[in-house]
Amino acid sequence: MITKELEQNMRKSVEAAQRNFNTIRTGRANTSLLDRLTVEYYGADTPLKSLATISTPDSQTISIQPFDLSSLVLIEKSIAMSDLGFTPNNDGKIIRINIPPLTEERRKEFCKLASKYAEEGKVALRNIRRDAIERIKKSEKESEISEDQSRDEQDNVQKLTDRFITEIEKNLSDKEQEILKV
C-alpha cells in the first residue's frame, strides 16, 4: 500500500544520519569534514566546494586550492571562524589544514556527537512510522481496508522501521570504531 513511499522516506533519514556521521573528524584527513562549510563570497554564503578544489595529499593534511585567488583570504577566515577547530595555513595560492591527532577526550566527545546524530535519525524514523500507522488506522476506520489488512500493514511498517534502525545502529558502531581507532 504505502510501503514504497515509506521506504524512500526512511532511506532518506538513514542517509541524513550518515551525512552527519561523515562530518565528524576521525583523526584522518577527509574532505567531507568541510562539506558544511560556507564562505561569504560576494555577499552570499557559498559552499566551499563550489569555490575551491579540496583534496587530501596525505592522511594528515587537507589542501584547498581556490578557483579565484581573491577568495583565498575569505576561505581562510571562514575555516578559522568555524567550529571545526582547524588552523588554516595560507601560502598565497593554497590553504593547507594539518589535522592534529585526536586526544582521548576529543574522541569521546566525537563518539557522543555520533550517538546524538544516530538518535536524531532514529527519532526521524519513528516519526515516519507513526505517520504511516496513523494513515493505516485512518484507512481502516474509513473501511478502506479490513482489520487484518491494517494489522498486516502495521506489522510491515514496524519491520521496515526495525530494519532501518538496525542500519543506523550499525553505521554508528562503524563510526565509533573509526573514531576510537588510534
Swiss-Prot record:
InterPro entries with a match to the protein in the record: Ribosome_recyc_fac, Ribosome_recyc_fac_dom, RRF_sf
Record-annotated disulphide pairs: none
Listed Gene3D superfamilies: 3.30.1360.40, Ribosome-recycling factor (1.10.132.20)
Region (Disordered): 137-158
Top-level taxon of the source organism: Bacteria
Keyword list, A-Z: Cytoplasm, Protein biosynthesis
GO CC list: cytoplasm
CDD domains referenced in this protein's UniProt entry, alphabetically: RRF
UniProt GO molecular function: ribosomal large subunit binding
Subcellular location: Cytoplasm
Biological-process GO terms, alphabetical: translational termination
Keyword Cytoplasm included in the entry's annotation: yes
SUPFAM superfamilies linked: Ribosome recycling factor, RRF
HAMAP family referenced in this protein's UniProt entry, alphabetically: RRF
Family membership: Belongs to the RRF family.
PANTHER family associated with the record: MITOCHONDRIAL RIBOSOME RECYCLING FACTOR PSEUDO 1 (PTHR20982:SF3), RIBOSOME RECYCLING FACTOR (PTHR20982)
Main function: Responsible for the release of ribosomes from messenger RNA at the termination of protein biosynthesis. May increase the efficiency of translation by recycling ribosomes from one round of translation to another.
Name of the protein: Ribosome-recycling factor
Organism field: Prochlorococcus marinus (strain MIT 9211)
